[in-house]
A protein has these predicted regions:
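Generic serine detector
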Residues: 13-16, 55, 74, 106, ...
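Helix N-terminus capping/helix-initiation residues
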Residues: 46-47, 68, 173
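Short helix-coil boundary/hinge micro-motifs
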Residues: 1-43, 58-95, 99, 117-118
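Short, cationic Gly/His-enriched loop motifs
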Residues: 80-103, 107-186
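Cysteine-rich micro-motifs
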Residues: 44-63, 166-168
Length: 186
């Protein structure tokens, strides 16, 4: 005998990242709402069979180098990562920052980043997006033309700081960044 739809409310499962989820609303097999049982309590619409399979994606699971996640915007929407099938430039900036600090291959190529970290807030892409306009040089970054190379720097403003955060970071041209690196190495 099949369970009634109301009997499925409260049913628990674990997703592929090990996060517990609970059905909080069951409309039918094709429309259920689950709440993840972590500090964020994200609610996601999915299908019952996906829930049973454990394939429901939690926006706060650490899917980027085992430290970063996409999160949700303040309006509850997923942050934009691609536009017309191409990674959004803001996502590329965020992902590159995470990769420099936590990617094994990147750390082998550039061991100077071995002590660098990303602040807890910015490990969530949605938070990084929210803070972007607060970063010094944001206008340069957002208005750069194709061919301009604008980079996120933690050293210039942070006096050689090892932490990526809004207080330490600024956007600068690649050429100014290289000049600053040479100046600091003297």
């Amino acid at each position: 005998m099949r369970a009634k739809r109301t009997d499925r409310i409260g049913e628990k499962s674990i997703n592929s990242y090990g996060t517990e989820m609970i059905i909080i609303e069951y409309c039918n097999e094709k429309e259920i709402y689950v709440e993840f049982q972590d500090e964020y309590k994200a609610i996601v619409k999915t299908r019952y069979w996906i829930f049973k399979q454990g394939s429901v994606a939690n926006p706060y699971d650490k899917t980027v180098y085992n430290v970063g996640c996409l999160g949700l915007m303040s309006n509850g929407e997923k942050p934009i990562t691609k536009v017309n099938g191409v990674h959004d430039f803001r996502y590329v900036t965020w992902h590159g920052m995470i990769e420099r600090c936590y990617g094994e291959r990147s750390l082998k190529l550039k061991p100077t980043y071995k002590d660098a970290e990303v602040c807890d807030r910015w490990l969530v892409y949605a938070n990084f997006l929210e803070d972007l306009p607060l970063i010094e040089g944001y206008e340069l970054y957002i208005n750069s033309k194709r061919g301009d190379y604008i980079v996120l720097d933690k050293d210039i403003k942070g006096n050689g700081a090892k932490l990526y955060c809004v207080e330490n970071c600024c956007f600068v041209t690649q050429s100014n960044n290289v000049k600053e690196i040479h100046y600091r190495q003297k």
